[in-house]
């Protein structure tokens, strides 16, 4: 799923340029743009359109890390 792939890349909390996201996820640039704009609209990521960069919103990042941790504990 493109959204999950992009969120996994953004989990480091740093700013990423769409071109970098496209290269690392092998997703088409139009899909990266569509997904990042959707995520920004609902405040899952911060989108700096002037600088053309995106990063995950800290509360979203904490939530995703907690979910992953719970999933890992369940699988143990």
Identify the residue ranges that each predicted region occupies.
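Short helix-capping/hinge SLiMs at alpha-helix to coil transitions
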Residues: 10-13
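Short loop/turn and capping residues at structural boundaries
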Residues: 21, 33, 50-51
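A short, conserved structural fragment
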Residues: 40-51
